[in-house]
Amino acid sequence: MVSHEENTSIVEWFLGPHPYTYPPYGIEMIHEDDEVAVAHHHHHHQSGEYYREYEDHRSSDVDNDEIIARTLQDDFLQLEIAESNDYSHQNQQQQHQQEGYTNNYSNNNNGYAWNDQSPAVDYSSEWIGNDNDQDGRSDDSVNVFSCSSPSDTDEYVYSWESDQCDADGEFGRRLNQMVPIPYIPKINGEIPPEEEAVSDHERLRNRLEMFDFTEVKVPGDGNCQFRALADQLYKTADRHKHVRRQIVKQLKSRPDSYQGYVPMDFSDYLRKMSRSGEWGDHVTLQAAADAYRVKIVVLTSFKDTCYIEILPTSQESKGVIFLSFWAEVHYNAIYLNRDTSETELQRKRKWWRFGN
C-alpha cells in the first residue's frame, strides 16, 4: 500500500482554492452502488433540459499504489502492441490469400479482378471555427472525425453519434444498460480530507481500468480543466488559454442560460473565469460543450457517481471527448485504449506520473 508520505504528496500535488460548482442543465449523472443494482426510470425536465442520473454497481476494492498503476499501464501498452501485431499478421495472411484467389480468378475471367472494386473509406473531417491562429489554422477549430478515422490521426474528437462506434466496446455496453433516475443540481462539497482523497484516487483508477481508459495527466495549476479540454480538442494542453477564452466568450453570449447556476453576480463570475489559474466548474464544462458542440463525458472518483455526461444544449453534438475528475479538485484528459495507437500510448505514458 502507499505510504503516508506518498499519500500526502498525492494531495499536495494540487494547488489553488477550491472551486464552487453548480452543475447546469445539460448534465447526466451516473451513479455507482457497492452492493445492489437499483433500477429507476424517471425524467426531470427543467429550463428546457433534462437531468438524468444512472445507477451502476461495482465494488471498488483494488489496491491503488504507484507500482500497480504503472504495471497496469504497461499491460495496456503491451496488449495494444500485441493486438496490433496480431492484427497486422492476420491482414497480411488475408491479403496473400485474396491476391492468390484474385490472380486465379483473373486468369480465368478475361483479367477481371473482383477485389479491385473495394469500397472507398471516407476519412474526411469537419472543422469548427473561423478565427485564424498563429499556426495557420482556425484558432477555435476542432477536428472532428468519425469512428472510421485512422487511429494514428494527429487530431480528432471521438464520435458518439453512431451506435456502431461503441456497440462492440464494454464502455458502450455499460452505458446502454444503465437506467435513468432524477438528478437535482447542487454545489460541490468541500475538498475531501487526505484519507478520502486517496480512496477517491483508488476508485478512479479502478474505473479507468474497468472502462479501459488511459489517463493523460495535466498540471494541477488551477487550469487543469481547460488543459484537459485543450488536450482533447486540440491534442495539446498548451492551448488552455484559448479554450478558456472560448468558454468565457460562450458564457457572455448566453448569460440567461448560465447565470442562474452561478452563486454570485454573473459579471463577477465572468471576470473570475477570465483569469488564468481560476478553477473551472460544471458551468464552464457546459459552456465548453455548447461552444465546441461536443458531448463531454467525465469519469469521476465520486463514491456514488461513476460518470457525468454533459450535452450541448442548442445544437447536435459533433463528437465526444473524455475527462477524468478526481476528488473534486483535478481534471485530466483520458482516452479509450482501443482508439489509441501505439505511438499515442507511448506519448501519453511519458505524461503519466504520480505524486508530482
From Swiss-Prot:
What does the record give as the active site? 221, 224 (nucleophile), 330
Instruction: Tell me the Pfam families matching this sequence.
Output: OTU (PF02338)
Can you tell which superkingdom this protein's organism belongs to? Answer: Eukaryota
Q: What class of enzyme is it?
A: hydrolase
**Which positions fall inside the OTU domain?**
213-337
Q: Where is this region: Disordered?
A: 86-117
Which Enzyme Commission numbers does its entry carry? 3.4.19.12
Q: List the disulfide bonds.
A: none
pH profile of the protein: Optimum pH is 7.
Entry function? Hydrolase that can remove conjugated ubiquitin from proteins in vitro and may therefore play an important regulatory role at the level of protein turnover by preventing degradation. Cysteine protease with a preference for 'Lys-63' over 'Lys-48' over 'Met-1' -linked ubiquitin (UB) tetramers as substrates. Also cleaves RUB-GST fusion.
Q: What is this protein called?
A: OVARIAN TUMOR DOMAIN-containing deubiquitinating enzyme 10
